[in-house]
């Protein structure tokens, strides 16, 4: 299972992340430069400079605005980064990218507020489903089998990103008991070991 560390938006933070982990970054434009920041109007480090230091397993490009996708793809190619997906690409762009260009490095969301039917409608079109855990784990054995049977890779959001560290062990135990296996977990660096232990 791949561990992906949440919101690693600086080179300094990137250097703290073990190489065997992935990272999630927030990408937006500032003029003609792609920068990293979760919030608007605050500036941030240039994505291109950041990628010079990236030597990790995976990257989630969390899109904070539209129209920057092709520039990110170009930078990923420049730095020979093949293992990544886009998160929060707008639906019209997902439609165009998947159906007109055959681009699959995209995650669609599934959660208690986002129906599984939306994810399943992208069977064969995108590689990943991003499973949010705002208040619950929205999976049981049946729903898990539907998603895996459709060929998706699954990335689960750690409940502690919503302030529920106590749920980590509950989720781990539930998944083990029900033979539910995630391809990736997005979590904070301090919680990574909780997901890796047997």
Which residues fall in each region the model found?
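Phosphate-group recognition and catalysis centered on beta-loop-alpha active-site segments
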Residues: 1-198
């Amino acid at each position: 299972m791949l561990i992906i560390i949440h919101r690693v938006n600086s080179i300094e933070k990137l250097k703290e992340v073990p190489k065997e982990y992935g990272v999630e970054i927030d990408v937006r434009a500032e003029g003609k430069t792609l920068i990293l920041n979760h919030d608007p109007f605050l500036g941030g480090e240039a994505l291109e400079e950041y990628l010079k230091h990236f030597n990790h397993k995976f990257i989630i490009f969390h899109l904070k605005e539209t129209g920057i996708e092709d520039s990110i793809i170009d930078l990923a190619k420049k730095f020979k980064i093949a293992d990544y997906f886009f998160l929060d690409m707008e639906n019209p762009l997902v439609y165009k990218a998947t159906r007109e260009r055959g681009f699959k490095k995209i995650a669609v969301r599934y959660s208690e507020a986002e129906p599984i039917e939306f994810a399943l409608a992208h069977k064969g079109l995108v590689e990943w489903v991003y499973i949010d855990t705002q208040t619950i784990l929205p999976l049981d054995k049946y729903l898990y089998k539907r998603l895996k049977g459709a060929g998706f890779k699954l990335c689960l959001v750690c409940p502690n990103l919503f302030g529920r560290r106590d749920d980590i062990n509950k989720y781990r135990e539930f998944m083990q008991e029900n033979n539910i296996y995630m391809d990736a977990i997005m979590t904070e660096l301090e919680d990574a070991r909780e997901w890796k232990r047997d």
